[in-house]
Amino acid sequence: MSKTRAQIARKHGAAAAGIPDAASAPAPSTAPRSNGNMLLIAAAATAVLLFGYYHLLALGQMSQLANGLTMPDMMFGGYGAAHIADLRAAMDEDALGQLSYLHKTAGTLFPLIFGIAWLLLIQLNVDRRWLRWLLWLPPLLFAAVDLWENVAVDALLAGSAPDDGQVALASALTVARWVLLGLSCVGGLLAVLLPATVRGKVPVRPVGPAGLTAESR
């Protein structure tokens, strides 16, 4: 009776059975994932620094130029026409120009870099396509809504007095950006903490010294 390749390998060695030796087999390259992890660390660190600078430092300093009034971007629960009217009365042209410049610099860089970092985080940790797109949705929406909110807030404070509809839109965008930022952070945690089987990550089967998996022995 003819012997199987596994039996031949056990008796005469892997070479006799035509099975490549595990020691000589090329190991799977981990360079792409290592490069991705390095990019992720750099992008995430930049996003955290920008968040701290933009929200905690720069917008706080802008409040000092508005008689202590909170900037609309920092009002998690939204705002009304009365608050915008108070801001318009308290801020001169120089202060409004500084806020607009802040929106165009740090206020633009933060959502873009945060979005890139979170997309990469999910890409590296989730292989199941439908789950990946589900987790990608909040950071994509956050970046779009945050950029739109910057324009809406600048429009409220510059030019003629805004109507109630403009204020309601800008307020809704502000609330939405904070909600989406929170959902994005939750999605990032899920991408890392969910079980590998849920994320579609298939563990590599251990290979024995004869190049045989556990199932073939």
Describe the role of every protein-language-model region.
Residues 199-217:
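Short, highly charged, low-complexity non-transmembrane loops/tails of multi-pass membrane proteins
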Residues 30-71:
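N-terminal signal-anchor transmembrane alpha helix
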Residues 142-196:
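Alpha-helical transmembrane segments of multi-pass integral membrane proteins
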Residues 7-29:
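N-terminal intrinsically disordered, low-complexity tails
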Residues 119-159, 215-217:
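Hydrophobic alpha-helical transmembrane segments of integral membrane proteins
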